[in-house]
Amino acid sequence: MKYFWFFVYEFIIIPIMVIIGLIGIYFNKKLRDGLSGRFHSRKVLKNYINDLNGDEKIYWFHASSLGEYLQTKPVILGLKEVKPHAKIIVSFFSPSGYNHVNDESIDCKIYLPLDFYWAVKSALHLVRPEKLIFASYDIWPNLIWAANELEIPTVLFAARFKKETGKLLPVVRNFYHHVYKDFHSIYTITKSDHNHLELMLKNSSNTTVRVLGNPRYDHVKGTADKFTMEHTKSVLSRKKRIIFASIHDEDQRVIYDSVLQLLNDHESLSILWVPHEPIASVINASIQRFNEEGYKVNVFSKQTPYDKDDPQVIVVDIVGVLSHLYWDGIIAYVGGGFSSGIHNVMEPAIARLPILFGPKYENFHEAEELINSGGGWAIDNGQELFDKINMLLSDNSKIIPASLAATDVIHKNIGAATRVVRGIIRD
């Protein structure tokens, strides 16, 4: 049956994906950049390998995008501590990872080659890594099957599955069964993920499966530790500021009127407004909307420094600063929950902020933990956002327990990176 699925994937699915990608490059710059980068990946690998002595141990990590790399980074750092002379290759699927990750712990960075069997087998044969390691969900069947044929152990960590995952549908499950069973080791985030995986494997695999947690908690904690000493004060000692982070158009349509109402009702309140895509048209539209309501707006960009004493509304036109900005707020709203799914809620949690987000959070274990602990809330409409934030702003006895509950979610989940590194080395 595996050969049947190989034929379907290699000669039907992948060609269709490539055709769609070739059409999409005329409309989407990210697709264009990604596809162009994939055609050069083998050349980059060959040049890198030719510069090595020949006896180095190489570990190849794959992360779909920036978010998955943030799960991967603490694992790479932990592996480097144990094996300081190991070489690290990291492949990315998305330009958001490739373009924004510049880390000294990475020895070679590439776009993931197109998942044609001949292409990925050639790349693996060239590199011959000790292990091929995937982060979270972005797995590519031919890459896994080729590694298995070349006897290169494959590892999947921070594996997670949607509650109603389509991977367990009868025909689809049979396909993914033949993909996942070729992994050497799989480390899931939760016991529920472990149970989904067991249903897929059907006890017919030699794959080692363990529940080891999510290393992204370790990354968030490690990042916060670098500047926490500057921000040891309670949320009640900070400026009364709400961080509206990673805002999509769908978020704006739902919450914008409620945000204005909060600003009108609380004179000392200020906000940081952080669009998900900080392109010029989005930034200018945000500025114009707040100006039309009578609010002076300052912009935080590469050219304009951030001033904590800025007026009521600050629009953020720069990426990579949210983890720091959260420490200047007392409450956070994290976007994406009215469209594709919520963004990173761990960073505001470690900054001790009560967190609100939209209804699409079910596939994010950390969001569920925040809700269960009292550190976060899902809202379905703008009125719910207003009521919850208004309650927190009006009653200090509500905001402090929520603040402590949010940060406790992070602290009780750290340590996964160490467990994953141990598994990579020992399993």
Located regions from the model:
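Helix-enriched interaction subdomains in cytosolic or periplasmic regions
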Residues: 1-35, 287
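Active-site and donor-binding regions of nucleotide-sugar-utilizing enzymes
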Residues: 21, 25-226, 247-249, 262, ...
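Nucleotide-activated donor-binding/catalytic signature segment of Leloir-type glycosyltransferases, i.e.
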Residues: 101, 106-109, 284-316
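Catalytic binding pocket for nucleotide-activated donors in carbohydrate/polymer assembly enzymes
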Residues: 183, 322, 326-408
